[in-house]
Swiss-Prot record:
<keyword id="KW-0813">Transport</keyword>
<keyword id="KW-0089">Bile pigment</keyword>
<dbReference type="InterPro" id="IPR038719">
    <property type="entry name" value="Phycobilisome_asu/bsu_sf"/>
</dbReference>
<keyword id="KW-0602">Photosynthesis</keyword>
<feature type="binding site" description="covalent">
    <location>
        <position position="158"/>
    </location>
    <ligand>
        <name>(2R,3E)-phycoerythrobilin 3</name>
    </ligand>
</feature>
<keyword id="KW-0150">Chloroplast</keyword>
<comment type="function">
    <text>Light-harvesting photosynthetic bile pigment-protein from the phycobiliprotein complex.</text>
</comment>
<keyword id="KW-0249">Electron transport</keyword>
<keyword id="KW-0934">Plastid</keyword>
<dbReference type="GO" id="GO:0009535">
    <property type="term" value="C:chloroplast thylakoid membrane"/>
</dbReference>
<feature type="modified residue" description="N4-methylasparagine">
    <location>
        <position position="72"/>
    </location>
</feature>
<comment type="subunit">
    <text>Heterotetramer of one alpha-1, one alpha-2, and two beta chains.</text>
</comment>
<keyword id="KW-0472">Membrane</keyword>
<dbReference type="Pfam" id="PF00502">
    <property type="entry name" value="Phycobilisome"/>
</dbReference>
<feature type="binding site" description="covalent">
    <location>
        <position position="61"/>
    </location>
    <ligand>
        <name>(2R,3E)-phycoerythrobilin 1</name>
    </ligand>
</feature>
<dbReference type="GO" id="GO:0030089">
    <property type="term" value="C:phycobilisome"/>
</dbReference>
<dbReference type="InterPro" id="IPR012128">
    <property type="entry name" value="Phycobilisome_asu/bsu"/>
</dbReference>
Length: 177
């Protein structure tokens, strides 16, 4: 995983060049939006349990066969595993959002995830739907539009960070579909 600073230095070093120009401007922008980024991550992690439980509940409401005796969420153990997996995915999305880099998500969470779920017989469409619900919830919390919870956030537009967060969830959906 490379943060924004390490990425710039690594790229400049590979070119045997000084850090400057567009790279410095990108870092300046990253720093100036630092408080918003921290608040965005905080809004997601502060509501992680709510986001994950809403996603799993929504997935089950749309596909009640998941909790039937032959379903993938039947028994407390399987339901707990489903919630745990949602928490892990959300945690790695929050790491990516914090660092502004998806490599931690890709390397430590998504690598081999589809194959694991396939071998366990987990339906990809239900999984993708739960991730889609988590994405909508996280974006709502970042934009401070979640109906039940309003946080104090710095003034300004957070739509860029919400869009960045959404792109990380899109990577998860693509990896498991």
């Amino acid at each position: 995983m490379l943060d924004a600073f390490s990425r710039v230095v690594t790229n400049a070093d590979a070119k045997a060049a000084y850090v400057g120009g567009a790279d410095l401007q990108a870092l300046k922008k990253f720093i100036s939006e630092g408080n918003k980024r921290l608040d965005a991550v905080n809004s997601v992690v502060s509501n992680a349990s709510c986001i994950v439980s809403d996603a799993v509940s929504g997935m089950i409401c749309e596909n009640p066969s998941l909790i039937s005796p032959s379903g993938n969420c039947y028994t407390n153990r399987r339901m707990a595993a489903c919630l745990r997996d949602g928490e892990i995915i959300l945690r790695y999305v929050s790491y990516a959002l914090l660092s502004g880099d998806s490599s931690v998500l890709e390397d430590r969470c998504l690598n081999g995830l589809k194959e694991t779920y396939s071998s366990l017989g987990v339906p990809a469409n239900s999984n993708a739907r739960a991730v889609s619900i988590m994405k909508a919830c996280a974006v709502a919390f970042i934009n401070n539009t979640a109906s039940q919870r309003k946080l104090s956030t710095p003034q300004g537009d957070c739509s860029g960070l919400a869009s960045e967060c959404a792109s990380y969830f899109d990577k998860v959906t693509a990896a498991i579909s």
